[in-house]
């Protein structure tokens, strides 16, 4: 883990700056750019979902014996949302899935128990366009239905303006632009690039 140079990290009124990773993982969901990083390949789909579920629901070491029939039915219900047929493959190792299927599964795992914040680190960048759209649409649906606070990192300017209600632009580790509300609603990619040029003193290609 990396620690901040200065300041505090406060989530829902609680200082989590130096909180242990296994503690804050109960309230923070995250997806990496690499679709292979969010799941355990040698464990089954059901076991991966059980790990995510138990991690968020229990305060002590979790054991698979705590997963009951009702929990497994909930797993199937969540998997059916993907429309990928994974609800009928729960006993298969995750390593047999495609990158897109694994990323979609990771999204379900990260939101199975609603987190206080969901962190998305370019989570569709490594996927083919069709799969990326499917995962992004599912992300939008889950975030909207559960009213989850979400922070998404992207290099896609269209996504930066289309998704969410606030756009931040960074340069060399510093936030140089923060737009929301009516100003953001009327912005185009060209406007965003121009604002970046004004704030950063240099041009950026889209």
Per-region residue spans from a language model:
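ABC ATPase NBD Q-loop/coupling interface
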Residues: 8-24, 65-66, 181-184
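Q-loop/switch helix immediately C-terminal to the Walker
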Residues: 43-58
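ABC ATPase C-loop
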Residues: 110-111
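Catalytic Walker B motif of ABC-type/P-loop ATPase nucleotide-binding domains
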Residues: 118-121
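Helix N-cap at the start of a conserved alpha-helix in ABC-type nucleotide-binding domains
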Residues: 129-131
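Helical segment within the ABC ATPase nucleotide-binding domain
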Residues: 133-145
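H-loop/switch region of ABC-family ATPase nucleotide-binding domains
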Residues: 154-155
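Conserved beta-strand-loop-alpha-helix hinge in the C-terminal portion
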Residues: 174-198
């Amino acid at each position: 883990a990396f620690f901040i140079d200065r300041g505090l990290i406060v989530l829902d009124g609680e200082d989590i700056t130096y909180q242990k990773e296994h503690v804050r993982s109960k309230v923070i969901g995250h997806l990496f750019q690499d679709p292979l990083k969010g799941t355990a390949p040698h464990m089954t789909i059901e076991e991966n979902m059980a790990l995510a579920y138990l991690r968020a629901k229990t305060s002590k070491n979790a054991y698979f014996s705590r997963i009951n029939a009702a929990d497994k039915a909930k797993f199937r219900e969540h998997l059916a949302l993907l429309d990928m047929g994974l609800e009928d493959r729960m006993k298969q190792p995750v390593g047999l899935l495609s990158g897109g299927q694994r990323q979609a599964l990771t999204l379900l795992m990260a939101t199975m128990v609603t987190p206080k914040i969901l962190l998305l680190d370019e989570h569709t960048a490594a996927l083919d366009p069709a799969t990326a759209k499917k995962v992004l649409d599912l992300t939008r649906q889950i975030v909207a239905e559960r009213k989850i606070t979400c922070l998404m990192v992207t290099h896609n300017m269209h996504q930066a303006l289309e998704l969410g209600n606030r756009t931040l632009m960074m340069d060399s580790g510093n936030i140089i632009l923060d737009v929301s509300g009516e100003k953001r609603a009327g912005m185009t990619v060209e406007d965003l690039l121009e604002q970046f040029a004004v704030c950063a003193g240099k041009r950026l290609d889209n």
